[in-house]
Amino acid sequence: MITVKLYGLLRIESGIREKQLKAATVKEVLEILAAYGIPPKDLNGCVILVNGNSANKRSKLTDGDTVVLMSPVAGG
């Protein structure tokens, strides 16, 4: 199982703080979360970390990995 943690607007919009999922890639994680009602546009623009390291949709996952998804921060 993969542990997925959501932060920022992703957490607020979905009501999901942490979820256990079965997925082989980050892309699969994003597809599963979209099925929970998170808008794909929000998922596509998020910051992705796997086990604390920068990742992308093509990143492969193994059992026990932690995926962190954060809304990008903007300001001025």
Language model features: what each stretch is:
Residues M1-G75:
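Ubiquitin-like/PB1-type beta-grasp interaction modules and other compact soluble beta-rich domains
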